[in-house]
Amino acid sequence: MGRKTQITKEIILETALQMLIRDGYGAITVKTLAAEIGCSTQPIVWHFENMNGFRKAFFEYCIDYAKSQFTVWNGSLDDLLTETARGYITIACNMPNLFRFVFVDNKDECKNSDVVQKLQLDNTKKIIRLLCK
């Protein structure tokens, strides 16, 4: 019977998110992430195989976190537009490193991300419905 994993993928991704928000993506390496968690580099390599695997999973994790910062709104078009803009502004002002990583530095990944498309589609569909009334 194998040992139970103590450093989970969730712990690694959450720690990396906090490092990103605090220090920016450039501060995140396998070694610095392991040091922040207080473990060897082995759990990170085991979960993600390499930095490319980590980056892909981390990008999706950051998108999910960014999405959680948007208010779900079912009111008027004006209110929906306001709340959507407020979500972007809140992230840009309060978590500029996260905003830069998700929406600026990774434009190509952002365009190809199903999660980002869903984030944009959720509000876009509501906006289109309200415009058609």
Residue ranges and their predicted role:
Residues 91-114:
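Amphipathic alpha-helical segments used for helix-helix packing
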Residues 109-133:
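Amphipathic alpha-helical packing segments from all-alpha helical-bundle domains
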Residues 1-7:
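N-terminal intrinsically disordered/low-complexity leader segments
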Residues 11-18, 22, 53-79, 83-90, ...:
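Alpha-helical structural segments
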